[in-house]
Structure formats: structure tokens, C-alpha cells
């Protein structure tokens, strides 16, 4: 019998100066960047927290604190890879991941496939195991006012 664990992650970043946002490991042209200590990939941060949460291993801030200068500007894909390596070492593997990106802008439809492909590559899995969806808050709240981006992520881990 296969054992399973479920993890949920959530992250938010405000817009800042810049000409693109990193989402799901993909640079997406935009009038702003995201304010963050690392590269600000809010999607990979939420996904990292979901993976860690499934095994009660804390959160991304515990493993890669923003008070540590070595993580300034860090590639969130590398952080996710390190986290997933520890998941594999613990005897688990990804069943599936489901991410919902919440923002008014930028428009993400043209980038969803690339995000799914990149996340699947980072997690050494099939693209069909990764879902990325985008939605808005109908111009309500901070995302609706175009002040930032939020992401929810859920993962299912299976014992190996």
C-alpha cells in the first residue's frame, strides 16, 4: 500500500522596480519586478512550502532565511531543487502539484505551458503531474489593485 502526504503552501510578493517577474521558473516580461530577498519567484516559493509542509519540515524561510546574505538574489529553482532532493532522500516522491497564481497582471495564459515544463523539470517528473492555473480577484484586494502576486500550491507526495 502506498502512503501519501499532502502539503499546502502560500506566498505573496509585492511589485517593485524591474522589467519582469519570475514565476514558476520562467521570466515573464512585465512593467514591474517582485520585491524579494531572492529572485522573488512566488510560485516556486509556495511550491517549496507545500513540499516542506507535506513532511512537516518547516518552511522555505527556515531553510533559506532572508536574513542570510548568501541567499540574496538566489535562484528559487535551485532552492526548490535542494528541497526536493531532501524529499527524495526521505523516501518520498511527487504524485502531483497544483498551483494557482492570483494576479491582475501580468496576463499569464501565454506562459502557463512554459511554467509547467520548468516546474516538471525541476521536480524530475512528468508535465502531467504539474498543474498551473491563473486567476484574478476581479480587481479586488492588493492583487486586484496590481500591487503584487499571490500563489497557492498543493502537493501530493507518495512513499517510494
Swiss-Prot record:
Binds 1 divalent metal cation per subunit. Pathway: Isoprenoid biosynthesis; isopentenyl diphosphate biosynthesis via DXP pathway; isopentenyl diphosphate from 1-deoxy-D-xylulose 5-phosphate: step 4/6. It catalyses: 4-CDP-2-C-methyl-D-erythritol 2-phosphate = 2-C-methyl-D-erythritol 2,4-cyclic diphosphate + CMP. Its EC number is 4.6.1.12. It holds the Pfam family YgbB. GO terms for molecular function: 2-C-methyl-D-erythritol 2,4-cyclodiphosphate synthase activity; metal ion binding. 4-CDP-2-C-methyl-D-erythritol 2-phosphate binds at residues 11-13, 37-38, 59-61, 64-68, 135-138, 142, 145. Keywords: Isoprene biosynthesis, Lyase, Metal-binding. Its cofactor is a divalent metal cation. Homotrimer. Involved in the biosynthesis of isopentenyl diphosphate (IPP) and dimethylallyl diphosphate (DMAPP), two major building blocks of isoprenoid compounds. Catalyzes the conversion of 4-diphosphocytidyl-2-C-methyl-D-erythritol 2-phosphate (CDP-ME2P) to 2-C-methyl-D-erythritol 2,4-cyclodiphosphate (ME-CPP) with a corresponding release of cytidine 5-monophosphate (CMP). Belongs to the IspF family. This is 2-C-methyl-D-erythritol 2,4-cyclodiphosphate synthase.
Amino acid at each position: 500500500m502506498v502512503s501519501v502526504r499532502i502539503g499546502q503552501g502560500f506566498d505573496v510578493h509585492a511589485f517593485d522596480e524591474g522589467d519582469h517577474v519570475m514565476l514558476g521558473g520562467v521570466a515573464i516580461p512585465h512593467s514591474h519586478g517582485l520585491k524579494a530577498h531572492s529572485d522573488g519567484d512566488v510560485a516556486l516559493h509556495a511550491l517549496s512550502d507545500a513540499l516542506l509542509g507535506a513532511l512537516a519540515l518547516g518552511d522555505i524561510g527556515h531553510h533559506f532565511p532572508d536574513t542570510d546574505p548568501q541567499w540574496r538574489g538566489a535562484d528559487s529553482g535551485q532552492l526548490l531543487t535542494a528541497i526536493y532532493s531532501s524529499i527524495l532522500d526521505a523516501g518520498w516522491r511527487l504524485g502531483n502539484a497544483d498551483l494557482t497564481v492570483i494576479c491582475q497582471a501580468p496576463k499569464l495564459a501565454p506562459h502557463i505551458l512554459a511554467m509547467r515544463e520548468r516546474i516538471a523539470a525541476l521536480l524530475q517528473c512528468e508535465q502531467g503531474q504539474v498543474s498551473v492555473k491563473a486567476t484574478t480577484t476581479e480587481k479586488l484586494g492588493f492583487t486586484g489593485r496590481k500591487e503584487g502576486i499571490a500563489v497557492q500550491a498543493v502537493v501530493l507526495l507518495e512513499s517510494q
